Design a protein with these regions (language model features):
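Alpha-helical cap/lid subdomain in secreted, periplasmic
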Residues: 37, 66-82, 91-195
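Boundary at the C-terminal end of the N-terminal hydrophobic targeting segment
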Residues: 11-15
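C-terminal segment of classical bacterial N-terminal signal peptides
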Residues: 2-10
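Serine-esterase "nucleophile elbow" of acetyl-processing enzymes
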Residues: 16-89, 99-108
């Protein structure tokens, strides 16, 4: 205890630097908007791998789906929006496509945020096969009346070390345009932070 009492105390605590504000992303989400306008519970499914699951988050309450749930509750008082976490560590397009019907469509969401490509990059997935799988999945979701936002890769050493990381991000952008899905580019956001 004497050691603690005699330790020097900084005159003023330093606050952590803040990230610059994220650029505004305009998304067309007619099914989600219709549910909210009608006063119905809106359901968002976060589909993906460990980034979605929250593998490296300090606790489950800090996974991005949990934070999204909290922020939506604060931003939309009076409306109920449920965000369901369907992230499974190590998965990518083949595994996520295989469980689309049971894990996603079955809960009848208005919106799916599909984080895909990081594990594919580390596995050196063929970009054309990746394109086919993601396109098939997005079309299946849209046919079920679900809005889709694709989420690309975050910058991290294991993904950045592969040429597939950039290629699969490019494919996601192309698929989003081709099929009319939204795109949330974590890569572009992180590049903005670096400037």
């Amino acid at each position: 205890m004497a050691l603690t009492a005699s330790a020097p105390v900084p005159a003023r605590a330093q606050s952590a630097p803040e990230c610059p504000p994220a650029p505004l992303i305009r998304l067309h989400l007619p099914h989600l908007q219709a549910a909210l306008t009608a006063g119905k519970e809106a359901v968002i499914v976060a589909l993906g791998s460990s980034s979605t699951r929250g593998e490296k988050a300090s606790d489950p309450a800090h996974s991005y789906p949990a934070v999204l749930q909290t922020r939506l509750a604060q931003a939309l008082p009076g409306w109920h929006v449920a965000v369901l976490n369907r992230g499974i560590n190590g998965q990518d397009a083949p595994e996520e496509l295989a469980r689309l019907s049971a894990d996603v469509i079955a809960v009848r969401p208005q919106l799916v945020i599909w984080q895909v490509g990081a594990n594919g990059a580390m596995r050196k997935s063929d970009p054309e096969r990746f394109r086919q799988r993601v396109t098939e999945g997005v079309r299946e979701l849209q046919a079920a009346g679900i809005d889709v936002v694709l989420m690309d890769n975050q910058h991290c050493p294991r993904v950045d070390a592969t040429p597939e990381g950039v290629l699969l991000d490019q494919v996601l952008g192309q698929v989003a345009k081709q099929v009319g899905a939204g795109l949330f580019s974590r890569a572009a956001l992180m590049e903005t932070w670096q400037r």
